[in-house]
């Protein structure tokens, strides 16, 4: 009433003389385009004309207390109390105390309960309500024909004992908790592989009728209820740690690349606080993150006091990414079994590597067959020299022969697919080499004859096809056995070349009949089958406090994420 520089803003009982009302009626207030309706303006006028009364006396000065006593008495902040059941005159028995409250309200409106629904409708209502599914015909018939006085109670018990009950009603809490199977925050939306365990925990809690206070405690502090270290966990310990997945349902981009880590961490904390308060307090506190809440009695100081409770487990300056927060469910026995199997895996892997090395050596030999004789040994040495130790000449030589340079464990599949063509090439080389060797034996023998006339005569006979030679020519050649050399007798005159041709032909046969790809795949399947025996390692997506960790508490200012 004292007012400011312009005097009192309200003239009690006289709106027409009130500075505040005149400003509102003229449209000067509220500012900009937030104009009040005629009805709202009339309400203000009546309030001033009727004395401008307030719920409580206005203080002479504003205290440091941010919230009034009236705000602190808001109904949602009051402890739960057991109400007296209203006494209501009823002509029929009521089945639940809740019915008395309902009937009392109905009577205040001059209403009453409708007639009791027939059993066919009751079982449908119950089934849809508790399971979200309609009853089948057998269940309906059984309930309708059940003459027991507690038939309804029996039906309720049967539906509550159904696994579908937890699935039906657990999903409502999962919605409140913001359950998600992926991290969100980024477009990658990384999968949360182990989030389902928290979902199953909630469903099981409903099905086992877990007390609500225990349900809340385990979700907020399951790690504090579990003895460290988190090894060889018993079923109860697993349950409590799994329950803390409640505090891990907020979007978390800290495990993704390309994000501002400080922003992502603080957003994850803020979203977790939002999940906790909206579900357990029934109110949003996000406004108090940057300033005192404008509508609810939540100060910015209170917000960061609440955040400080979470700081040991969610320390933005010593952050743990989603993968770092996982708790392994591997037992000591699992580790022993895994180690034993991994020894077998390594043995099978070593055996496969021996086969790979054998195929690499074989493929190198086959490719060297196709190279000129004078380059065979240089190419072999160049290939067998490690890349970092090769000379420039060796590197250049291999570059000119890519089919040798590219031989590796990874490329054996390609060489295996081409084995038919490669074996034909090797066979052709062996054939040509054999013919050249036979011709060489004959040529060297003729050159060794001293009598030129004999040499000339024998050369002329050789020009005649063997099937067209006469007896005289055959007798003449019979006296000079080297000139009758064939593939079968080549070893008598050039053993080294005959052996080489035989090796080439054997290599061609092996190349044609050896499927390196299949052999390596079969060995890999053996390795995979052994590795599949390793017990699968499951994890708990939990929120835990690092041991001996006491972070500092910060009061952030708007937009400040890093100081």
Kindly give the residue locations of the regions a language model identified.
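Short, solvent-exposed loop/turn elements at beta->coil junctions and helix N-caps
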Residues: 64, 232-233
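Aromatic- and Gly/Pro-enriched helix-to-coil junctions and flexible linker segments
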Residues: 1-223, 293, 313-444, 452, ...
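Sequence context surrounding c-type heme c attachment/ligation sites in exported
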Residues: 14, 31-38, 186, 225, ...
């Amino acid at each position: 009433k004292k007012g400011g520089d312009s005097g009192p803003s309200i003239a009690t009982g006289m709106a027409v003389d009130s500075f505040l009302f005149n400003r509102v009626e003229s449209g000067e207030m509220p500012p900009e385009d937030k104009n009040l309706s005629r009805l709202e303006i009339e309400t203000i006028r009546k309030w001033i004309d009727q004395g401008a009364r307030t719920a409580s006396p206005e203080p002479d000065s504003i205290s440091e207390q941010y919230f009034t006593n009236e705000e602190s008495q808001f109904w949602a902040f009051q402890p739960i109390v057991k109400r007296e059941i209203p006494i209501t005159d009823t002509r029929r028995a009521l089945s639940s105390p809740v019915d008395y409250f309902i009937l009392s309200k109905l009577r205040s409106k001059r209403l009453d309960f409708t007639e009791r629904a027939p059993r066919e409708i009751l079982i449908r209502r119950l089934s849809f309500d508790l399971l979200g599914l309609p009853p089948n015909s057998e269940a309906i018939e059984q309930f309708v024909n059940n003459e027991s006085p507690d038939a309804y109670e029996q039906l309720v018990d049967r539906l509550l004992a159904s696994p579908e009950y937890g699935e039906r009603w657990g999903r409502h809490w999962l919605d409140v908790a913001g359950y998600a199977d992926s991290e969100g925050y980024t477009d990658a939306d990384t999968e949360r592989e182990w989030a389902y365990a928290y979902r199953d925990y909630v469903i099981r809690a409903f099905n086992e009728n877990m007390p609500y206070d225990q349900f809340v405690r385990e979700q907020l502090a399951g790690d504090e209820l579990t003895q460290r270290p988190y090894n060889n966990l018993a079923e109860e310990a697993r349950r409590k740690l799994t329950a803390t997945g409640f505090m891990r349902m907020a979007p978390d981009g800290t495990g993704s690349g390309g994000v501002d880590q400080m922003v992502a961490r603080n957003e994850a904390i803020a979203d977790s606080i939002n999940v906790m308060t909206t579900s357990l307090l029934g109110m949003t506190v996000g406004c108090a993150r940057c300033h005192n809440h404008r509508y609810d009695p939540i100060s910015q100081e209170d917000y960061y006091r609440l955040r400080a409770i979470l700081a040991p487990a969610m320390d933005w300056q010593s952050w743990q990414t989603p993968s770092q927060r996982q708790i392994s469910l591997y037992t000591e026995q699992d580790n022993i079994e895994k180690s034993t199997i991994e020894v077998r895996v390594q043995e099978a892997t070593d055996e496969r590597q021996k086969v790979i090395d054998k195929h690499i050596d074989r493929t190198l030999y086959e490719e060297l067959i196709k190279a000129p004789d004078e380059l065979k040994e240089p190419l072999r040495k160049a290939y067998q020299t490690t890349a970092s130790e090769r000379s420039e000449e060796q590197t250049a030589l291999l570059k000119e022969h890519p089919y040798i340079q590219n031989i590796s464990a990874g490329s054996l599949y390609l060489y295996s697919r081409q084995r038919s063509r490669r074996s034909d090439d090797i066979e052709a080389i062996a054939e040509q080499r054999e013919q050249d060797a036979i011709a060489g034996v004959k040529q060297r023998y003729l050159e060794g004859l001293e009598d030129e006339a004999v040499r000339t005569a024998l050369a002329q006979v050789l020009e005649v096809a063997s099937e067209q030679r006469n007896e005289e020519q055959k007798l003449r050649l019979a006296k000079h056995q080297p000139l009758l050399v064939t593939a079968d007798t080549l070893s008598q005159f050039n053993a080294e070349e005959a052996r080489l041709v035989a090796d080439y032909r054997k290599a061609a046969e092996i190349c044609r009949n050896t499927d390196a790809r299949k052999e390596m795949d079969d060995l890999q399947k053996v390795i995979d089958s052994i590795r599949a025996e390793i017990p699968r390692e499951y994890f708990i997506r939990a929120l835990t406090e690092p041991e001996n960790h006491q972070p500092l508490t910060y009061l952030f200012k708007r937009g400040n994420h890093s100081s």
